[in-house]
């Protein structure tokens, strides 16, 4: 049969209306006001502003206008927090803490915010002509695309792409150790086999030879599996490094701190259309010849 999700429609979420907790999807035609809490089990759409509020979303979040907060303390806390299982799309974000399970798309600007996603972050409109990423810390798993990154006389913009890289490195180390153990065991078996060949021909020698052959077959099977896992892990690492890029459509300002897969770089001057990526064990800033297409939803705020 057809499954119909429950949808709750509200005008404004303010002190008069109260906090909202709903298991289905929520459409708010107005604003989510200061100090309010909205929890949606499904998707959440806000036609207006989200101002110093707390949002928890089980699906995707769309904010037609902006998500705005203010700093709470010197430790970096913000008055506006968003935790979303799916993707997040908003026109602008300022002094907010946003974590999403899917991609995060901000149409015009992200200012002094903390952004986290295992996916990609895009700060750009559909035409890639505006979109400023200034200040704050953005930690993503795949790629960052913005029109302008950093600002004149600003050195507080931090961009980190880590994703699965630490996990892949740890697994690679583990597989390498397993391969070495298997190779040592096979070498020890060679020594044992040489000693058996020196024994007088008889039942005992034959028994030991059969046992060694069975053990060799088992060890060789393990070693082959481990070598295949090594190749797979290396391919996954290479694929991650190939797509872990920061793409800047117009201006990258000096003082932007970048970390990709554990390697660090600080932009030393202003760059025009460029990309930052991993190359031969270092991060490099190179000209960007083509931007990826805009594959985001047509519902993205413009």
Describe each model-derived feature in a short phrase:
Residues 1-118, 122-123, 132-137, 141, ...:
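Charge-rich, low-hydrophobicity low-complexity segments
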